[in-house]
């Protein structure tokens, strides 16, 4: 049987009979990996937020999306310590069981929402720049972000409704609730990826006819972030679908699926620390801002405490920190 903290596992009668030897692997790997991911995500995403607020133009819609994507990753990473502490049993009661899974759903849906909207925005900016002239107002920024978070809360309600504490485990109380949640996640994931794929096909067709290096840089980073998200979450969504029991499985195949589920879940849940790394390696402006920030901090440490020292602001250079 898998760890009690697997969010979307439903142990039917067959899987209950098929006891396996992956509990030790699951527990140890979860504790070690999630502790590391939590620290990396906390540091990395906090640095991204600092760079955005300190050095960048928050009137840019793209930067607002990046900021909210950071908040979503931080929200997810804050769930990991609870996940670690609840490896053997759920100790926080029904309310926090529901709340915990709802926050998980909100961070999951908000991430894919913001990635999809970022791609659509970049598609419009490249393919039809005139159509984006009126969407950079404060009212538009507030409206878009509010709608995304509201929709994320709405989509995550089933995760809260169908979860409860059963035998000291926080899990789905009804099999149909598990099925509905998995189908919703997978359909939403596939639709979003379909929209993103369409947008990038059109973007690439347009960019082949233009030589704007700024546009190429921006598209390249957003594309890298989207690909990283897809590669992280697609295997997890696939194993979730297989766990629904749609495909008839033997005891041996269930054991193999349990191991695959652990590995895919670890990969998916580690995604919250990936984006800051991608920004460093792909985002030229972000890398320059980060270097400037570290130089300022280093100079402040070397300066006498009697001399006031505060990091300055970077000169605004463009619509986003790519």
UniProtKB/Swiss-Prot annotation:
The chain crosses the membrane at residues 28-55, 66-85, 99-120, 138-162, 186-204, 221-243, 260-283. GO terms for cellular component: plasma membrane. It is a multi-pass membrane protein. Disulfide bonds join 97-170. Residues 1-27, 86-98, 163-185, 244-259 are extracellular. The keyword Disulfide bond applies. Expressed by dendritic cells from the thymus, slpeen, subcutaneous lymph nodes and mesenteric lymph nodes. GO terms for biological process: chemotaxis; release of sequestered calcium ion into cytosol; response to cytokine. GO terms for molecular function: chemokine receptor activity. The keyword Electron transport does not apply. InterPro entries: CCR1-9-like (IPR050119), Chemokine_XCR1 (IPR005393), GPCR_Rhodpsn (IPR000276), GPCR_Rhodpsn_7TM (IPR017452). Receptor for chemokines SCYC1 and SCYC2. Subsequently transduces a signal by increasing the intracellular calcium ions level. Receptor for XCL1/Lymphotactin. Belongs to the G-protein coupled receptor 1 family. This is Chemokine XC receptor 1.
